[in-house]
Amino acid sequence: MSEKVNLYFTDYNCVKLLKITAMIIGVPKEIKNNENRVALTPAGVMELTRRGHEVYVQSTAGVNSGFPDEEYVAQGAKILPTIEDVYAIAEMIVKVKEPIAPEYKLIRKGQIVFTYFHFASEKDLTEAMLKS
């Protein structure tokens, strides 16, 4: 995890100090056939970066959803050229669909993968996730 960030929240005129851990979040381009969505929009990136998180988006990850790289950069994301780069730097990967075989080797032990998983139909995926 990256550095600790102090955030102040007000609730009924009471100020509370909460310690949270900022994360390094990666958004790879979806490589599953016919998947054109992206896991985070530029607006989502803005919300995360405002809260102290670092967001790395693979180049052209949002293009098929109508979001060019420049929109992500304008909201605080950093663009990386390859899927390997995104997986290598991120503590948490955010995806629309479950990882497919070429991605299995990219997932590191302890890395969080935030996506929809359907383990019942994918034995290889289940085994790969258990190993990571």
Features from the language model and the residues they span:
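Structural/interface elements that position substrates and couple domains in central-metabolism enzymes
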Residues: 20-131
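Polybasic, lysine-rich low-complexity intrinsically disordered segments
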Residues: 4-5, 19-20
